[in-house]
């Protein structure tokens, strides 16, 4: 999703200039020109469809995990599988192990075939941009950082002129490359603020599913309720892109990258606060109050607390808006700030932040049970709000730097 550009005074001419999205980060642009979206190429839609298929597979596998981690109280299937007729448990286990290894072998061979085809396809498609090999850029980047560390953590110490003057040494990089590393490090610092954001975002695929299981679902599987998150992302995305951002630009409101991410953090805090409120309502409602599905009135886990599951809807709406403001902007920010040959590396660090967020989620697992869930959501809401404040204080200066760069 393309982020809104800085608002500027309208051009005296009425001509509309379309900016190619692939050139925005590398070509000097007249700030008085209006900013409009370029047409998305068909190849991009193909890649988007493939990515959607991958996400379908990912969530199709991971979402049921929560149900296995916390099976219904009355479920016998979650505990054992009875053999049919005279089959023995040993036979079923042997077949199961064979199926596992056979499936893994099929996956390996299918993946190997797909890789071979993906190497051949670009040779016959003129739409692929083929770049000449430039070698591994990581050793050069490591050398720049090493020089900066020896120079008291100042990147200026890695400049060719500094190395030549102080060490009579010629280096293999230029000032442009050092400045690219400087911008890439800015993106890496911003990623640190997203660790707790990813912890909160992961609640949609675990604890919020369990929360739905404690409510009246009217026959809808509780793991299906979490589908409201991607639904609202799809709905709110165009609303924000086509409605909010142009409106802010029209009124000369500078809603830049750092501002959008900080706003998304506050929205994420609000979604966790609302989830805490929903959990409080569940605990205040019978038949089991703060012990859902476990009291005698639940009839062995069959009767949840009498709260409508669609009370969760605002949680997913706010969470979707937070995801659009913060996560989408992070992807854009890391891509535009990263050095030309290190974009994939810097964006991969975003996934490292997600891994750290998951580690925090594991650490707070002792709170993820009744009747402590309300305090877990409240703690996440407060912590996320504090992160938003600190994030804004530390990184708001980069808004001004971005305006100067543009």
Swiss-Prot record:
Transmembrane regions: 184-204, 220-240, 262-282, 309-329, 344-364, 373-393
GO molecular function per UniProt: transmembrane transporter activity
Record field: compositional bias (Low complexity): 14-25
GO annotations of cellular component type: membrane
A Pfam family that the UniProt record links to this protein: PTR2
Disulfide bonds: none
Cited Gene3D superfamilies: MFS general substrate transporter like domains
Region annotation Disordered: where it falls in the sequence: 1-25
Induction: Expression is down-regulated by ralstonins, lipopeptides produced by the plant pathogenic bacteria Ralstonia solanacearum. Expression is positively regulated by the imizoquins cluster-specific transcription regulator imqK.
Lipid bilayer topology: Multi-pass membrane protein
Keyword Nucleotide-binding set for record: no
Keyword Transmembrane helix on entry: yes
Keywords: Membrane, Transmembrane, Transmembrane helix
Entry similarity comment: Belongs to the major facilitator superfamily. Proton-dependent oligopeptide transporter (POT/PTR) (TC 2.A.17) family.
Role, per record: Peptide transporter; part of the gene cluster that mediates the biosynthesis of imizoquins A to D, tripeptide-derived alkaloids that serve a protective role against oxidative stress that are essential for normal germination.
Name of protein: Peptide transporter imqD
Species assigned in the record: Aspergillus flavus (strain ATCC 200026 / FGSC A1120 / IAM 13836 / NRRL 3357 / JCM 12722 / SRRC 167)
């Amino acid at each position: 999703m393309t982020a809104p550009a800085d608002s500027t005074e309208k051009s005296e001419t009425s001509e509309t200039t379309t900016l190619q999205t692939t050139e925005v980060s590398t070509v000097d642009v007249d700030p008085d020109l209006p900013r409009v979206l370029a047409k998305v190429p068909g190849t991009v839609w193909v890649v988007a469809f493939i990515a959607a298929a991958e996400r379908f597979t990912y969530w199709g596998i991971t979402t049921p995990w929560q149900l296995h981690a916390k099976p219904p109280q009355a479920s016998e299937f979650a505990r054992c599988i009875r053999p049919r007729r005279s089959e023995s448990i040993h036979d079923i286990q042997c077949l199961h192990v064979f199926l596992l290894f056979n499936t893994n072998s099929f996956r390996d061979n299918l993946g190997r075939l797909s890789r071979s085809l993906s190497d051949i396809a670009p040779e016959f498609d003129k739409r692929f941009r083929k770049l000449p090999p430039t070698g591994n850029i990581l050793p050069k980047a490591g050398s720049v950082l090493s020089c900066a560390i020896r120079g008291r953590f100042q990147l200026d110490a890695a400049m060719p002129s500094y190395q030549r003057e102080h060490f009579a040494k010629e280096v293999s990089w230029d000032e442009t490359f050092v400045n690219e590393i400087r911008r890439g490090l800015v993106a890496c610092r911003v990623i640190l603020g997203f660790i707790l954001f990813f912890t909160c975002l992961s609640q949609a695929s675990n604890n919020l599913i369990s929360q739905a299981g404690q409510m009246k679902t009217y026959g809808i599987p509780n793991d299906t309720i979490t589908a409201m998150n991607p639904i609202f992302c799809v709905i709110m995305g165009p609303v924000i892109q086509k409605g909010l951002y142009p409106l802010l630009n029209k009124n000369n409101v500078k809603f830049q990258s750092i501002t959008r991410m900080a706003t998304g953090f506050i929205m994420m805090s609000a979604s966790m606060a609302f989830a805490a409120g929903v959990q409080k309502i569940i605990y205040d409602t019978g038949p089991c109050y703060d012990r859902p599905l476990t009291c005698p009135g639940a009839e062995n886990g069959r009767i949840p607390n009498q709260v409508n599951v669609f009370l969760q809807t605002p949680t997913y709406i706010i969470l979707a808006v937070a995801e659009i403001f913060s996560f989408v902007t992070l992807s854009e920010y890391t891509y535009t700030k990263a050095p030309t040959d290190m974009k994939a590396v810097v964006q991969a660090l975003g996934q490292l932040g997600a891994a750290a967020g998951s580690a925090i989620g594991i650490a707070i697992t002792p709170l993820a049970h009744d009747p402590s869930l309300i305090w877990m959501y409240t703690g996440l809401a407060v912590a996320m709000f504090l992160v938003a404040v600190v994030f804004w204080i530390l990184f708001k200066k980069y808004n001004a730097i971005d305006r100067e760069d543009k």
